[in-house]
C-alpha cells in the first residue's frame, strides 16, 4: 500500500479476527486519504475486533497516528476514535494505541481520558513500569532528560493493566 497506515500485530494462535477496518481521522472518515480539520497531512486509525481463543471474550484494538501539527485535528481525532469504539464494540473492552503526537498535558489527551466514554492511560493505572519514561527519542536532537512521552496505550475500565514497559532505544525484543 501507499501512504499513511497504522498496523496492528497480534498472535494468530491466541486471537481470532472477527472484523477489521480503518478510518481516516477527518470529517469524512470513510473517504480514503481525507485530511481533517487543521491537520498537516492525512492520518488514519486501524481497528480490529478480536475474540480471545481461550476465554471467548471479544475486544477491540485500535492503532493510530495523530497529526503532528493540527491542534483541532488531534482533539477531533480523539472524539472520532471514541465514537468508533462505541459503534463497533459498544461497552466491550477496547485498547487504543498509537503515536498521538501529544503529551499528557494536551487537550486531545484530556479528551481521551475525560470523555463520558471512559478510557484510561495504561501507564497511569499500572502498578509497575519498566524501561524509560519517554517514547519520543528526539531524533538525536533532544537530550535524554528532556525527551517526552507522546505514544500512549489507552484502555477501557474492564481491562486490568499489570505492567507497562517502554523499551529503551533498540530493545524491541521485549514484546
Predicted features, each with a name:
Residues 1-58, 163-167:
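Structured beta-strand-rich core segments of catalytic domains in phosphoester-bond hydrolases
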Residues 2-5, 42-46, 57, 62, ...:
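Residues that flank catalytic or metal-binding motifs in active/ligand-binding sites
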Residues 14, 72, 76, 83-94, ...:
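Metal-dependent phosphoester-hydrolase catalytic domains
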Residues 20, 62, 72-74:
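A short secondary-structure junction signal
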Residues 61, 94-96:
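Hydrophobic/aromatic residues located in beta-strands of well-ordered beta-sheets
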Residues 64-66, 99-100:
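Active-site metal-binding loops of divalent metal-dependent hydrolases
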Residues 69:
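A short, histidine- and acid-enriched strand-loop-helix "catalytic/donor-clamping" loop
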